[in-house]
């Protein structure tokens, strides 16, 4: 029996994608091979690779000025890879910290430069807000400005993206990429692990403006130097072939859904239903300012936290899984990525109301 999976990542995949992957597992398109067995330089995999790149470019409307790279290492590795590729001769980069993930990025950058904290969204209740552009205190000549546009743990999503002129804006988009249209031209670099909205764990997507490819530090490993990866079409080292294949299937699924505008409308509906239920309740609480509440990751707390385990057990009995909040913040978290259907959110909301009634 399939359940409703609210995991923050690895996360739910579209059932259509899973069924297609199962059907093609032993014999991809008459090749007599599984994708797992293919040479990454063979014509079969190259067709998968090129189609995935083209579909992602189409979905996000990536301009010709930007290159799309498939790498390994996940979003955490990019926290080191970004400064090694962008610092050049500069000694500092600016960070807008809106949650746990941008804090990790800031801390990792200390190994390569002297990062400058341009703004923080931390309050007495934790990370509950996104500083406005007027609050950003940028340094004189930063190599780049780093922002995590959706904080998976804290549930803070930044929607308003400022124009920084000549300073490259770097965004960790791991947990909201492909959930809504984006103006890619505003960014110098976008990066994200695949295991939330793109596909399965194993591949990391980097979208980088081409004029930024000459800034790498000499200590940057060749396999993670964006210029080298770009010049070799993401094939400098053996890529995560099956993860790219699954990502490609997800891209095709998104196109069948009507693209990112249609997906965004669906995601807005799902998030509104869940937040409205929380806000109308006297039992559940979300601490994030409404204007920056994440559409993808919805943390919430029970009024009586001694009931947490009972809540999770009851949810599991109804086929509602992976609702436990991150260990650093506690409570609950429902991750409602693209592949989580509206029916799943409705089932969760019904359960939340039932649990509150029983508790009362």
From Swiss-Prot:
Positions with a binding annotation for L-glutamate: 41
GO CC entries: cytoplasm
Domain of life: Bacteria
Pathway where this protein functions: Amino-acid biosynthesis; L-serine biosynthesis; L-serine from 3-phospho-D-glycerate: step 2/3; Cofactor biosynthesis; pyridoxine 5'-phosphate biosynthesis; pyridoxine 5'-phosphate from D-erythrose 4-phosphate: step 3/5
CDD domains: PSAT_like (cd00611)
Chain positions with N6-(pyridoxal phosphate)lysine modification: 196
Residues noted as binding pyridoxal 5'-phosphate in the record, renumbered to the chain: 101, 152, 172, 195, 237-238
Keywords, in A-Z order: Amino-acid biosynthesis, Aminotransferase, Cytoplasm, Pyridoxal phosphate, Pyridoxine biosynthesis, Serine biosynthesis, Transferase
Cofactors that this protein relies on: pyridoxal 5'-phosphate
Xref: Pfam families: Aminotran_5
An annotated Gene Ontology molecular function: pyridoxal phosphate binding
Quaternary assembly: Homodimer.
Its job: Catalyzes the reversible conversion of 3-phosphohydroxypyruvate to phosphoserine and of 3-hydroxy-2-oxo-4-phosphonooxybutanoate to phosphohydroxythreonine.
Family statement drawn from the similarity comment of this UniProt entry: Belongs to the class-V pyridoxal-phosphate-dependent aminotransferase family. SerC subfamily.
UniProt name for this protein: Phosphoserine aminotransferase
């Amino acid at each position: 029996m399939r359940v409703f999976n609210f995991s923050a990542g690895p996360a739910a995949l579209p059932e259509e994608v899973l069924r297609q992957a199962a059907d093609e597992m032993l014999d991809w398109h008459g090749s007599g091979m599984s994708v797992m067995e293919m040479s990454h330089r063979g014509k079969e995999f190259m067709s998968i690779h090129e189609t995935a790149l083209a579909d992602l470019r189409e979905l996000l409307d990536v301009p010709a000025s930007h290159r799309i790279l498939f790498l390994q290492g996940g979003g955490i590795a990019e926290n080191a890879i970004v400064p090694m590729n962008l610092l050049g001769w500069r000694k500092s980069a600016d960070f807008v910290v809106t949650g746990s993930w941008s804090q990790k990025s800031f801390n990792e950058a200390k190994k390569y430069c002297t990062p400058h904290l341009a703004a923080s969204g931390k309050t007495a209740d934790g990370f509950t807000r996104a500083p406005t552009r007027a609050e950003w205190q940028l340094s004189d000549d930063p190599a780049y400005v780093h922002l995590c546009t959706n904080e998976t743990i804290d549930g803070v999503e930044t929607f308003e993206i400022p124009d920084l002129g000549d300073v490259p804006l770097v965004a960790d988009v791991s947990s909201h990429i492909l959930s809504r249209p984006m103006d890619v031209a505003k960014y110098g670099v976008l990066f994200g692990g695949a295991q939330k909205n793109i596909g399965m764990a194993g591949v990391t997507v980097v979208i980088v403006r081409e004029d930024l490819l000459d800034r790498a530090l000499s200590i940057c490993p060749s396999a993670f130097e964006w210029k080298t990866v770009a010049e070799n079409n993401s094939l400098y080292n053996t890529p995560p072939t099956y993860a790219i294949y699954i990502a490609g299937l997800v891209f095709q699924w998104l196109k069948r859904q009507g693209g990112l505008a249609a997906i965004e409308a669906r995601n807005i509906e799902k998030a509104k239903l869940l937040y409205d239920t929380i806000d109308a309740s006297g039992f559940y609480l979300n601490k994030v300012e409404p204007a920056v509440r994440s559409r993808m990751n919805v943390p919430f707390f029970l009024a009586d936290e001694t009931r947490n385990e009972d809540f999770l057990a009851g949810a599991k009995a109804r086929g509602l899984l992976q609702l436990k909040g991150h260990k650093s913040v506690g409570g609950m978290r429902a991750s409602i990525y693209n592949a989580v259907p509206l029916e799943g959110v409705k089932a969760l909301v019904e359960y939340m109301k039932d649990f509150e009634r029983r508790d009362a």
